Each structure stands twice: as structure tokens, then as C-alpha cells.
Amino acid sequence: GRWQDAMTLDFAEPQNGFDSPCRFGYESDYLVSHYDQVETLFAKAVSARVPLNWEQGALKQAPAFLYDIAPAGDAKRFLMARIGQDKPAGIREDLFLLARSTPAPVGHMRVKEALQTESGRRAIGFERKEVVGRDNRFLEYAYEEGAAIGGATGAGGEAPKLLLAQSREGLLYPDAVLADEQVIQHWFVKFSRN
């Protein structure tokens, strides 16, 4: 498949992060591409609670699906320790990390701004034993590249988890750093809490 711009989100008070009033709506081109699925149960929507439709939505806080893809727990702490100094004033950590560190969350979505942040960097692959052994160099790189999975439910939580992509050469990379045609298999790796 090919990636498409599906939705635009606008936070009125970025200093309040996910607690900010939020307006959101599907992109017209995306709706036209999926016209036969508008307002159907199994549409290619960002969430079952936000079906494809032509209306703009508004909530007093971020839509729930964002909590499922934003870094949380161990991933959030690690990322803020590493890149927190880059956070602009006037934006809370959750929005900063959403825009910076979610190029490949679980599911069929990507945060476009996070993917653009990572473009131009050289991809570094790791052998399976480095991943299994939780090699520090590997973990730091994986977190920095957005392979760490956050969120309050599902794949998120406190235990470190990573989405990885395996290349034809057998090396493992944080998901989204390799072009889709270079990937032969995807891996979801969950480490113990300690």
C-alpha cells in the first residue's frame, strides 16, 4: 500500500497537551479515496470511535486514540531524558513526543511530523543477539528512532516494548527507518519490566 494523509488535528492550547481542546477532521482527499466506506463500521478510520465522515470534530481534550499511540511509561521517560531539551516552551511533553517520536506506532497509522523528523538519518541495523541481550547501544537507538511503543492500553504500558523491522540481510531496525520494500518481516518485542 501507500501512505495517505488521513486526518488533521489542531490543539487550541498546546501548553495543556492532551488536556487541550482539540479540533480534528479527515482530509477531503482521504475521504474521496474511501468514499464507499464513509460512515461504515469497517472503514479505514483512525479509530472505531471516529468513523470516516465529512464533519469536523471537537473535543475538550485529545481524542482517545492518541493516547494509544503516544509514548508512555518507560518509553516516555527515556525519550524525555534524551530529547526533552529540544521541547519548545509552550508545548507539553505528550504533544511534543506525539509530533517527534511516533513515526511507527502500532496499527496502520503514522504521525507524519514524526516521520519527517527522522528522515535523512542513516539507518543502523542490529543482530538478533543484540536485541535479545538488550544491548544499550541498540536500546538507545531504538528509542530515539521511535520504535518504543507507548500508550495506556494494548501494546503500551510500563514494560519496554519495541516495533522492529527485519531487513533482507537479517538485521533488525526500529520500524519506520527502513523503506517498506526493504522489510521482510515485522517484530513486536516486549521486554520484562526489570
Region annotations inferred by a language model:
Residues G1-N194:
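Phosphate/dinucleotide-binding and metal-coordinating scaffold of catalytic cores
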